[in-house]
Amino acid sequence: MPPLKRVKRANPYDLYRTCKRWKCPLMSFLKVEGKTVADKYCSMGSMGVYWRLALHGSGRPTQGGYVPLRGGGSSTSLSSRGSGSSTSISRPFAGGIPLETLETVGAFRPGIIEEVAPTLEGVLPDAPAVVTPEAVPVDQGLSGLDVAREVTQESLITFLQPEGPDDIAVLELRPTEHDQTHLISTSTHPNPLFHAPIQQSSIIAETSGSENIFVGGGGVGSTTGEEIELTLFGQPKTSTPEGPINRGRGIFNWFNRTYYTQVPVEDPDEIAAAGSYVFENALYDSKAYKHEQQPWLSRPQDAPEFDFQDAVRLLQGPSGRVGWSRIIRPTSIGTRSGVRVGPLYHLRQSFSTIDEPETIELIPSTVDEEEVLTGVPESAEGPDAEYSDIDLQSIGSDEPLLGTGIIYPLVGGGQIFLCMHRAPVGWSSGTYINHEGQSRDDGEYVIDNGGQSNITPTVVIDGSIALSLEYFRHYYLHPSLLRRKRKRNPIFI
């Protein structure tokens, strides 16, 4: 059995050319020549549409009808239907009203009557239409007719001569043409969005507007308007929300201990550097070039160890006014389907946590009361007391100079007021020395003039000793104790 094969059908136009000499089905000829029933219906329909549109657009081919009057007042009009059309006369009124009576009818515009006048030769076209002769011939038939001509010529420049000594010459100029009138129009459009300030009566000595001046929160002068009482928002005074927070359930609740391991941290951002390495850039670190100071640069260094540095996924939680949370999943075993096996950690930093107060031991600060000691040390007690001879070259001595007790500095001068105070940390102690001239019983007069005295001071301790809070220091160096400077002569070689 031969295989079934689809044979392509021939084109009707090819069959028409082939069957022109042979007998072929009639349908092929009609289709190619366009003589089928469908072609006939289409031709007849298109013909009807064409004639319908042609007759409708041409209008009614009749004459007559009312034609309005033209500007010339003529009743004869030429129709504009074509160059070969005939002239038609239109009658505006069927009753045959004569044309002369149209001027007396107020409902119609009077026609323009063109007067036929003889053409005057020799008259310029710019000459006036009415010509007045210089002399009018006297005619007996024209009695009572007087023709007069008034010639008035205005001077353009008028010079007024001064008549008296007080007069001033005035030169009056008139324009050559008529006065030029300028038309000026003004239109005013009110703006509903703008309101001019209303000047109100101000108080005495007020020179500025009272609408925009505020002193101390109040308006100066009389103010108008509606007073609106403001509400003070004093609550809440804390950043913690008052109402409960709608938390998720199951794995969406980060505080669920079934799915997450709660880890309180101080700063969750420290774990953001997980998986990064720390190295030094030699371009910005000058010490990196000195290998003798940093021998460890030759070998690789490990990254610093952070908590949860093996986190491969960070989820930033809702940052509210209470705390800050992060969810991390450390590296663990995973399958091809994407399932990860491992714990989830919830890192939480609470902002509203109040820590326990730290106990700080305070150092007591005490100030001694003023204490006045009346009396003198034993070594200077009385005029008959024996003085100890002390070698000035000696550095130390077995016996105390002033006995036991308070140590007083040796100050040369007369009566001494020694002020000492045991001050706490942060205070400074000082001495106040009152230098006064003193006359002793043996006739010796001690002059205390500070560093300007030429007398070598002696070690004299006398008078009362007062302890007070006086902070003054007066130090004088006697000129005899100064080192003399040797003048050096320059040596020229």
UniProtKB/Swiss-Prot annotation:
Region of interest: Disordered: 64-89
Post-translational modification as stated in the protein's UniProt record: Highly phosphorylated.
A single cellular component GO annotation: host cell
Keywords on record: Capsid protein, Cytoplasmic inwards viral transport, Disulfide bond, DNA-binding, Host endosome, Host Golgi apparatus, Host nucleus, Host-virus interaction, Late protein, Microtubular inwards viral transport, Phosphoprotein, Viral penetration into host nucleus, Virion, Virus entry into host cell
Span of the annotated motif Nuclear localization signal: 1-10, 483-489
Cellular compartment(s): Virion; Host nucleus; Host early endosome; Host Golgi apparatus
InterPro entries: Late_L2
Biased composition regions of type Low complexity, renumbered to the chain: 75-88
Pfam families for this protein: Late_protein_L2
Predominant subcellular localization, coarse grouping: virion
Family affiliation: Belongs to the papillomaviridae L2 protein family.
Subunit structure and binding partners: Interacts with major capsid protein L1. Interacts with E2; this interaction inhibits E2 transcriptional activity but not the DNA replication function E2. Interacts with host GADD45GIP1. Interacts with host HSPA8; this interaction is required for L2 nuclear translocation. Interacts with host importins KPNB2 and KPNB3. Forms a complex with importin alpha2-beta1 heterodimers via interaction with the importin alpha2 adapter. Interacts with host DYNLT1; this interaction is essential for virus intracellular transport during entry.
Protein name in UniProt: Minor capsid protein L2
Organism field: Odocoileus virginianus papillomavirus 1
Top-level taxonomy: Viruses, Monodnaviria, Shotokuvirae, Cossaviricota, Papovaviricetes
Gene: L2
